[in-house]
Amino acid sequence: MYPAHLLVLLAVCVSLLGASDMPPQPLNLVQFSNMIQCANHGRRPTSNYMDYGCYCGKGGSGTPVDALDRCCKIHDDCYGEAEKSQNCAPYWTWYTWKCGSDGPQCDDSETGCKRIVCDCDVEAADCFAGAPYNNANWNIDTKKRCQ
């Protein structure tokens, strides 16, 4: 083996070791992101919803700032109910769905926890698509506005 090949192999191994320390991303967030794009027909990037208002993104508290933020609170509550009543792990639950001309739809074969989580995501994605987006509510100071 050539010395250059050994260096490349070593670099790959070191980078893989570093990546093993990174926490895995919840699988469901990928599906939910795709579902949002289906519902809004690609009009707004999913990243715009990651740090919006008091509830869109990680965590949530206080009173939602507008209709879109209420969609996120409803979604958070839906996941919370799935965790409590069905013992689901919504962020890790993988389900089957399709993107139709009228928006996202859960596969009819899904039941139990998968169906509940899929329904939560469809409801939220449709809600996002129907709610106005206010740029002033993106990346707000949650300590001040979300009491």
UniProtKB/Swiss-Prot annotation:
GO terms for biological process: arachidonate secretion; lipid catabolic process; phospholipid metabolic process. It is found in: Secreted. Residues 20-27 form a propeptide. It is an enzyme of class 3 (hydrolase). InterPro entries: PLipase_A2 (IPR001211), PLipase_A2_Asp_AS (IPR033112), PLipase_A2_dom (IPR016090), PLipase_A2_dom_sf (IPR036444), PLipase_A2_His_AS (IPR033113). One of its GO terms (molecular function) is calcium-dependent phospholipase A2 activity. Its cofactor is Ca(2+). Residues 1-19 form the signal peptide. Its EC number is 3.1.1.4. CDD domains: PLA2c. The active site is at residues 75, 121. PROSITE patterns: PA2_ASP, PA2_HIS. The keyword S-adenosyl-L-methionine does not apply. It comes from the Eukaryota. Expressed by the venom gland. SUPFAM superfamilies: Phospholipase A2, PLA2. Its main location: secreted. Gene3D superfamilies: Phospholipase A2 domain (1.20.90.10). Snake venom phospholipase A2 (PLA2) that inhibits collagen-induced platelet aggregation. PLA2 catalyzes the calcium-dependent hydrolysis of the 2-acyl groups in 3-sn-phosphoglycerides. This is Acidic phospholipase A2 S3-24.
